[in-house]
Amino acid sequence: FLPLLAGLAANFLPKIFCKITRKC
């Protein structure tokens, strides 16, 4: 469960960061 969650976060967080900071 945790590795899956970590993988999901690793895939999801950069997209949020990209939207917030507008640095992609």
UniProtKB/Swiss-Prot annotation:
It is found in: Secreted. Keywords: Amphibian defense peptide, Antibiotic, Antimicrobial, Cytolysis, Disulfide bond, Hemolysis, Secreted. GO terms for biological process: defense response to bacterium; killing of cells of another organism. Expressed by the skin glands. Disulfide bonds join 18-24. One of its GO terms (cellular component) is extracellular region. Shows antibacterial activity against representative Gram-negative and Gram-positive bacterial species, and hemolytic activity. Belongs to the frog skin active peptide (FSAP) family. Brevinin subfamily. This is Brevinin-1E. The lineage of its organism: Eukaryota, Metazoa, Chordata, Craniata, Vertebrata.
